[in-house]
Amino acid sequence: MQTSRISSFFRGLVHLYRWAISPFLGAPCRFFPTCSEYALVALKKHPLRKSLFLIAKRLLKCGPWCIGGIDLVPRTSVEEYLSSPTPLAESPDDRTVPHTQETS
């Protein structure tokens, strides 16, 4: 499918950024999740066009004029990020939703 190839291309660009550019920038991201993880999760959870819109919107917020904070991809929760053994952006199966422990 053409869309999945394009989505894979954009995921590859994000991984390239993480590997080749991000280590040299120094300052940590102001947001949780980081902008690169946000991009990977958006590409995983939403259609390509919506993902690109969400990523662009997030990157426009990234700068010294913004305080930062928690800014999750729509249709995700903090619990999903915190309970996942691997980052949501890296999980092998899109259908896998991390479970949360229930207290009795």
From Swiss-Prot:
Coiled coil: none
Classification via InterPro entries: Membr_insert_effic_factor_YidD
Disulfide bonds: none
UniProt topology in membrane: Peripheral membrane protein
One GO term describing the cellular component: plasma membrane
Keywords carried by this UniProt record: Cell inner membrane, Cell membrane, Membrane
Entries under Pfam families matching the protein: YidD
Cellular localization per UniProt: Cell inner membrane
Primary site of residence: membrane
Region annotation Disordered: where it falls in the sequence: 83-104
HAMAP family associated with the record: UPF0161_YidD
Protein's job: Could be involved in insertion of integral membrane proteins into the membrane.
Family recorded in the similarity comment: Belongs to the UPF0161 family.
Protein name per Swiss-Prot or TrEMBL: Putative membrane protein insertion efficiency factor
Organism: Chlamydia trachomatis serovar D (strain ATCC VR-885 / DSM 19411 / UW-3/Cx)
